[in-house]
Amino acid sequence: MRFKGLDLNLLVALDALMTKRSVTAAARSINLSQPAMSAAIARLRTYFGDDLFTMRGRELIPTPRAIALAPAVRDALLHIQFSIISWDMFNPVQSERRFRIRLSDVMMLVFFERVVKRLAREAPGIGFELLPLTEDPDELLRYGDVDFVILPELFASSDHPKAKLLDDTLVCVGCPTNKQLKRQLSFENYGSMGHIAAKFGRTLKPSIENWLLLEHGLKRRIEVVVPGFSLIPPLLSGTDRIATMPLRLVEHFAKTTPLRVAELPLALPPFAQAVQWPSLHNRDQASIWMRQVLLQEALHMTAPRDSVEYRP
């Protein structure tokens, strides 16, 4: 089908090439033969008057023109998908929809476990692909590579809808044998003790606790860096190191792991965890239903603090 001289099928090919960066992989992803994909590239080059891609080894490298076209092409295809193709009534009981969700290990353990258990009973055909927060949320949402991103609201994109799920707060934790945590921590003690910290992604981006601590002038001597908060408690055992962690996760580990919990030398404000979805998914029936499930489960979460033993 042509629209003003452009074969619209070529947009599907261009999107696949930008995503896969390989002629073979792109052809396979949209059920084309490799010769057919090569022909599509030739036609795209003719229409746009640009090479669009060059080869570096086996990888396709997009030209500036291809990079500029990519977001508009992806937006157009997603708009067609969610406003025309997918506009069927969604029945969660019968659906086999698989939701792709990016979230931290914290929310995986303290929140999403509830969602998975509930839907195993109520909508057993629903599946999930749960992935770590390793990339820029803006990019993930813009290209529709995820159905949802669950992250601290401070880091949410301003270009896509969001909804608050729950509040959390930060506390200091250590091994029960850590004598320095038997008394109120001073700024000096907190800064001089060895810390274990979480950083995320390939570039080890600072986590929420690092952002809040720096924002309020609290500095740490970080001795160990791990790629997620859930790896911290076992590494505290038998050491005098401490860590700053979300209280809900501390509550989760306190059921099985001995921890000494202390107040930070400066009371930090609570922070919110939020869910975001691509703006083009806003009217998608499956997305709407899943949002409702997430918000309902968040409402059932009790406020943190009551179940953790603060040991003097």
Swiss-Prot record:
Q: Does the keyword Plastid apply?
A: no
Which part of the chain engages DNA, per the record?
Answer: 23-42
What is expression of this protein induced or repressed by? By flavonoids.
Which Pfam families does this chain map to? HTH_1, LysR_substrate
Q: Which CDD domains match?
A: PBP2_NodD
Show the coiled coil region(s).
Answer: none
For this protein, the record's InterPro entries field holds:
LysR-type_TF, LysR_subst-bd, NodD_PBP2, Tscrpt_reg_HTH_LysR, WH-like_DNA-bd_sf, WH_DNA-bd_sf
Q: Describe the location of the HTH lysR-type domain by residue ranges.
A: 6-63
The Gene Ontology terms for molecular function here are: DNA binding; DNA-binding transcription factor activity
Task: Enumerate the UniProt keywords alphabetically.
Answer: DNA-binding, Nodulation, Plasmid, Repressor, Transcription, Transcription regulation
Q: What does this protein do?
A: Represses the expression of the nodABCIJ-nolO-noeI operon.
Q: Give the UniProt family note.
A: Belongs to the LysR transcriptional regulatory family.
Q: What name does this protein carry?
A: Nodulation protein D 2
Q: Which species is this UniProt entry from? A: Sinorhizobium fredii (strain NBRC 101917 / NGR234)
The beginning of the lineage is: Bacteria, Pseudomonadati, Pseudomonadota, Alphaproteobacteria, Hyphomicrobiales
